[in-house]
Amino acid sequence: SMLKFESVETNCNELGIEKNKVIAYWKDFDHIFRNRALDSLEERRIRKIYEYRMDSAPYEWGVKPVPKIESAEKLLKKIIQDKSSLCRFGDGEFEIMRGHIRPWFQSVSETLKDRLIEVLNSYEEFINIAVAQNFVDLDKFKERDADIIRAYMAYDTRKDIINFLDMKRTYYDAYVTRPYILYKNKRNAERLFPLFKKIWKDRSVIIVEGKYGRIGIKNDLFDASKSIKRVICPPRDAWMFYEKIKQTVIDIACRNDLICISLGPTATVLAYDLAKIGYQAIDIGQVDNEYDWYCMGADKRTSIKGKMVAEIKENNELEDFIDSKYFSQIAAEIY
């Protein structure tokens, strides 16, 4: 054993044998016992990271053209001022538009694809179109998250997304609903969460969410709202129930209500359709999960008791959920 061999080395030393004369066949001078396969995989992973960084660099440095995307803070201040609506396009929406499967909770659909393209190409003064800022200023994100974004945007993805966009148009940042977990520091969250709260302060709010969303429960995100009604939708493939969801919201909502939607790519289309007929509708994405993580001081995505977190495989106690306030707010359930 190595232990016994080390004692032999000690004996040799005591006998006055020079150290450089002792050949230690079982001593790992050159790391001969390391797992070469794992080393090779790690080297390949690191090489890929730098490959993606080099691929992204011309866009991040302004050498190649990128879409104009205004800040999340500017977007929220605009919504507060003019009560406009919001449709968001992140990786899930763009992947469906490319005919790919991305979000596990929504199957690919040609009708959804066509509607998303319609919304992205629309020009309505009272509807803000937001696109994920995956092109520049990635240094504000944690290194690992920035590298994940670069890896996603590599090869044909960036080109395909740019081809969907109007390079003469001004968009807003779809990461507005992701103000915390991606960022290196909390300053972004400290600016944006109060602005979200101002949007629904003293407003009658209708929350359209998946079965396990439970937005605003066990936190104070919506405490400043005047009232809350909830439309509970299927936790997956909400698009299959789109017309029923839309009609249910219309039946429940009053004209001055604020409609907040967290329903994956379906939310993008629903916010657009409701805004077109006179409602203020906002795709709030996963801002509630982000707020919970912010309140926890979490440094990575983690499960939230009683709530579905899309990126977490193990979600805690989804079925054994009891909250009288939440159940009293449910105006309709769609299954």
Question: Each PLM stretch: what is its role?
Answer:
Residues L3-F222:
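Electropositive, gly/pro-rich neighborhoods at or near active sites that engage anionic ligands
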Residues E70-A72, T111-E118, F241-I252, T266:
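A short, acidic, amphipathic alpha-helical segment used as a generic capping/interface helix at domain edges
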Residues Q133, I232-P234, G285:
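Residues at the C-termini of beta-strands that transition into short coil/loop
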Residues V136, P235-D237, D288:
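Residue-level detector of flexible, active-site-proximal loop/helix-junction positions
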Residues S204, S227, Q280:
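Residues at the starts of beta-strands that form the adenosine-phosphate
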Residues K211-N256:
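A mid-sequence, solvent-exposed acidic-amphipathic segment
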Residues L258-I261:
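Short catalytic-loop micro-motif centered on adjacent basic/acidic residues
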Residues T266-Y335:
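C-terminal functional extensions of proteins
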